[in-house]
Amino acid sequence: MELDGKVAMVTGAGSGIGKAAALRLARAGAKVAALDHTEESARKTAEKIRGLGGAAIALAADVSDAAAMQAAYERVGREWGRLDVVFANAGINGVWASLEDLTPEEWAKTLTVNLTGTFLTVKYALSLLKERGGSVIITSSVNGTRIFSNAGASAYSSSKAGQVAFAKMAALELAKHRIRVNVICPGWIKTEIEDSTEKRDLEEIQEPIEFPEGPVPLTDGGPGTAAQVADLVLFLASDAAAHITGTEVWIDGAQSLLQG
């Protein structure tokens, strides 16, 4: 599963799954464009890759900003002249609240970052990807694909379901260009994203469901790791997955089978 000589764009590369994937792809030989919403977080990931002997550039951009994403890919083209892998991973949990309490602005922000951001990440990659073909991997979630019991996650789940539909449409459209498009659906993974989730008054709509032994059967209830997800990203980016496209892969330790 070596990626020697290949170039990868990773969004949300400053932390969590994105950072782990950027490092994993670099260890496999890829040159990595580490993109995050802040310059500092992108720079730290790029520096870590270079410290391991890899090649990386840091890019700061809001994935929902069309001009910024177009400029980011132009920088990749100038730097390395090619693109082989896109990991469209950036996203937010947003606000989790009842439908009555969730504001239109909160709904729109989650959909804009997660779904429009994915569209722009793929759209502006195509001029480079079409030159040689390649692999696009999109981070969705168990929410909106198998799990619908997390109260208040209507905006988040809708954005994640939308990513799956988008990926399937893109996979068919881009197959003739030898571009594969697949989706990963992580369950409970130990990252920092939960810390930025705003949950409001969910007690009023939460169904009283309990899992005494924890929600993840494969790990005796505990979460998976970002490194495990990064290994899946590497597989889908590599030639080992050369005949896989338009497919969701759940990486959740059977959580969604229990909790959905």
Predicted regions and their residues:
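Short C-terminal tail/terminal secondary-structure segment
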Residues: D4, N93-W96, V233-L234, T245-G260
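Short, small/polar-rich loop/turn modules that mediate ligand/substrate recognition or access, typified
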Residues: A175, R180, I244-G246
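Conserved glycine-rich cofactor-binding loop
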Residues: V7, G14-G16
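Active-site helix of classical SDR
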Residues: V122, S159, A167
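Catalytic Tyr-x(3-8)-Lys segment
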Residues: L202-Q228
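Substrate-binding pocket helix/loop in short-chain dehydrogenase/reductase
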Residues: A97-L99, T103-A108, P212-G214
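Residue(s) in the substrate-gating loop at a strand-loop-helix junction
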Residues: S141
